[in-house]
Amino acid sequence: MRSMNLTKNAKFESVRKNIEHYLSTDWFMWVCFLIACFITVLRVEVIGLLIFAAIICAILVFCEDVIVALEPFLLLCLCLIKCNNSYDEFIKMVWLAVPAAAAIIFHFNYYQRKLPHGELFWPMLAVSVAVTLGGLGKITAKEYFSLMPIFFTLGLGFGMLLFYNLMNSHVRLRENYSLPDKISKIMIIMGLFCCFMILEYYGEHLDKVISTHGLLAFQWRNNASTFLIFALPFAFLRSIKGNHGWFWVGMLFYGCMMITGSRGGAIVGTAEVMMCMIALLCLDKRHRIHNIIIIAVGIVMFFVFFWDLIYFFRDMLLRLLQIDDNEIRVRLMRRAVEDFLSNPVFGRGLGYFGNRDVHHSAKGALC
């Protein structure tokens, strides 16, 4: 089938390989980064969805290597984290599912490969079964088969198993580049764009920062800090393996994570940086003395500006230290225990909406 496709589409193959070569370059990754920056500055997330959807569809058609689509996909996800409660706006874009499905079907048909069972197949299968059977005996058939629950149940259940098998067959070691190196570049560019979003927001509201001498509160801070948590280790990894300048990129990620004001980001990010520092000192022997000096200076600067930092981060620290019993997170934790005890084997399931009295999720979302 593969050889027949190549013979039949020789002209397409010639054009395709040239396009794939460009789309696989670092230059194209930075072009996507700049597009995402313009989308953020101009506040045109809906147009951004169209642009990146077109880019991803083009990649699926012209690129055998699906890893190329990862960077624009992550940048698109970051662009959309600002769009809170936008179900009514984005549901109008549901027609995009048609070209997206066509591109996906074309890709996995034209670039056919066997679907081997990877090392995680059986654990993924167990998770898929658990998600599918979730809520058994506790929710009604109407609740289970309503639109949003069944969408998430299929997508996060056997849909993820199918996705894993497809990716496992198409993402493989390449001769022209190192896969770990490629992924680290993608994650770092994603992190840099996230930093751009945060710093751009601070720049736009700089007068408020100066007047309050404190953090800005914004709706998407937890999402942004989550993306930075994923990106941060890759900067330190590149610092260990190559240019020491990547160390400062990692510190930029941590700094931006802190100024989001996310409590989870502050806790996890600080622990993550500490682990990365330990790895850096143990593995990067060439710059060990240099790194020790930098860390020592950083600790001294922290204590010199201790009270200034405490004042700047006061809102986050207060929210971290003064957790009220009626806070949504605390009530949800309590409710989680109750829900588990009510059905220890199958749980409540993704179709259960009985916790909306504690936290009313956005339209089109489960939580």
Residue ranges and their predicted role:
Residues 42-48, 86-95, 148-152, 215-228, ...:
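Membrane-interface micro-motifs in multi-pass membrane enzymes
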Residues 323-334, 338-342, 346-367:
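Long extracytoplasmic/lumenal interhelical loops at the membrane interface
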